[in-house]
Curated annotation (Swiss-Prot):
GO terms for cellular component: cytoplasm; EKC/KEOPS complex. Transmembrane segments: none annotated. It catalyses: L-threonylcarbamoyladenylate + adenosine(37) in tRNA = N(6)-L-threonylcarbamoyladenosine(37) in tRNA + AMP + H(+). This is tRNA N6-adenosine threonylcarbamoyltransferase. It comes from Methanopyrus kandleri (strain AV19 / DSM 6324 / JCM 9639 / NBRC 100938). Its cofactor is Fe(2+). Required for the formation of a threonylcarbamoyl group on adenosine at position 37 (t(6)A37) in tRNAs that read codons beginning with adenine. Is a component of the KEOPS complex that is probably involved in the transfer of the threonylcarbamoyl moiety of threonylcarbamoyl-AMP (TC-AMP) to the N6 group of A37. Kae1 likely plays a direct catalytic role in this reaction, but requires other protein(s) of the complex to fulfill this activity.
Length: 346
């Protein structure tokens, strides 16, 4: 089976082509860059996606060596995300599936980040079936684990997602978008300043940290030192709540996924924690960390194999988007099952 997945929840646009044994044939991306000093403008991002998607889809199929008639399934990111952006991907996916007369698989974006991480872990030799997952991105900061047939939230941010916090700081101090990689680069050259640390059980709060970091910069601290302090403090908070959730659940597998998982320092801190407590940790590869079409395609295959895809004749009325689609609302009947054939892929 070959699935084409379309990702369009926010500023990133992606098309992935994946087989049902977990082979990623292609994973192409485009990104909307907001105006300097501005955050993501949803309608402008959607216009960018509308312009770029036809060429991106054509390039994906060409690079994968796949003809339209080879496609067995189409998947799209149903939510959560920005409404205008989600609708671009959903409309394209509906049109493609109807044209090809193949099923359409709606995918929860957060679940897809977990599933692509589990796939990559298994392909790298980690037998991860039910890890505690730290999912960190521009729009989400959650500690997730499988319980009672769903991915449940065992910890999360009480205000800003960590990626949004980093991007906001970067924008306020004049760094280009996306801000996370710029902060990571500067932090390597700095000595961490002391900043407030806010953990409540297995939840975190980043608004006070952001305000304090901006104040230190405005008061004359070196940007490199503030970036180092911001990273160390935020990431220590995230590692603490992940460790606490793993201890409460009695789990010894830890998965780090989402766009912020590409940060080397966060990955290093998470792996150090896991080693200290005798657990195994795995960080999703950088090319699969941020939003991408391959994760949608792979999860779409899981959705379809478990009877949750939409038949062609039902697509017009059932292929919708859900801007506030919580991860614990999404059924994941495959998640607790033994590893599939993809486990043996190297």
């Amino acid at each position: 089976m070959i699935c084409v997945g379309i990702e369009s929840t926010a500023e990133k646009l992606g098309v992935g082509v994946v087989t049902d044994d977990g082979e990623i044939l292609v994973n192409v991306k485009a990104q909307y860059i907001p105006p300097p000093g501005s955050g993501i403008l949803p309608r402008e991002a959607a216009e960018h996606h509308s312009r770029e998607l036809p060429e991106l889809l054509e390039r994906a199929l060409k690079n994968a060596g796949v003809e339209p008639e080879d496609i067995d399934l189409v998947a799209y990111s149903q939510g959560p995300g920005l409404g205008p952006c989600l609708r671009v991907g959903a409309t394209a996916a509906r049109t493609l599936a109807l044209t090809l007369e193949v099923p359409l698989a709606p995918v929860n974006h957060c679940v897809a980040h977990v599933e692509i991480g589990k796939l990559a872990a298994r392909q790298d030799g980690f037998d991860f079936d039910e890890p505690v997952t730290l999912y960190v991105s521009g729009g989400n900061t959650q500690v997730l684990a499988l319980k009672a047939g769903r991915y449940r939230v065992f910890g999360e941010t009480l205000d800003l997602p960590v990626g949004n916090m980093l991007d906001t700081f970067a924008r306020k101090v004049g760094l280009p978008h996306p801000g996370g990689p710029e902060i990571e680069r500067l932090a390597e050259e700095g000595e961490p300043v002391e900043l407030p640390y806010t953990v409540r059980g297995t939840d975190v709060s980043f608004s006070g940290l952001l305000t304090a970091a901006l104040r230190r910069y405005e008061q004359g601290d070196r940007l490199e030192d503030v970036c180092a302090g911001l990273q160390e403090t935020a990431f220590a908070m995230l590692v603490e709540i992940t460790e606490r959730a793993a201890a409460q659940l009695g789990r010894d597998e830890i998965l780090l996924t989402g766009g912020v998982a590409a940060n080397r320092r966060l990955s290093e801190m998470m792996h150090e924690m896991a080693e200290d407590r005798g657990a195994e940790a795995y960080t999703v590869p950088p090319e699969l960390a941020g939003d991408n079409g391959a994760m949608i395609a792979w999860t779409g295959i899981l959705v379809h194999e478990h009877g949750l895809s939409i038949p062609p004749d039902e697509i017009p009325e059932k292929a919708i988007v859900k801007q506030r689609y919580r991860v614990d609302e999404a059924p994941v009947p495959w998640a607790a099952r033994p590893s599939r054939s993809a486990d043996s892929q190297g």
